[in-house]
Amino acid sequence: MKKAMAILAVLAAAAVICGLLFFHNDVTDRFNPFIHQQDVYVQIDRDGRHLSPGGTEYTLDGYNASGKKEEVTFFAGKELRKNAYLKVKAKGKYVETWEEVKFEDMPDSVQSKLK
């Protein structure tokens, strides 16, 4: 009986790990130890989607510090300024925070992509 419980526990743990690896959304990515946090730099180049009762959701293409293209989706409590540059702290599809930055403060590899 103890062997069966141990095997069942190992199979359950393996199922949870496989689920974290193959199913990506903002909740699973937040806790997945295999996904690393990175800064993604974006420019507000289009309108966001207004949500009820308030706030705006943005889905934008941006670039990480090495210049790799990434898509991020995040929420803002208000509509953001057009053409503003943001640094988004993302871990997969999970966005922890965002902040407005100056163009000069972004890495050179990102500046060349967002001109």
UniProtKB/Swiss-Prot annotation:
- SUPFAM superfamilies from the xrefs? BC4932-like
Highest taxon listed in the record's lineage:
Bacteria
What does the entry say induces or represses the expression of this protein? Answer: Transcriptionally regulated by YxdJ. Induced by the antibacterial protein LL-37, probably via YxdJ.
For this UniProt record, the keywords arranged alphabetically read as follows: Signal
Q: Which Gene3D superfamilies match?
A: 2.40.50.480
The intrachain disulfides are: none
In the record, which residues are listed under signal peptide? 1-29
State the protein's name.
Uncharacterized protein YxeA
What organism, scientifically named, is this protein from?
Bacillus subtilis (strain 168)
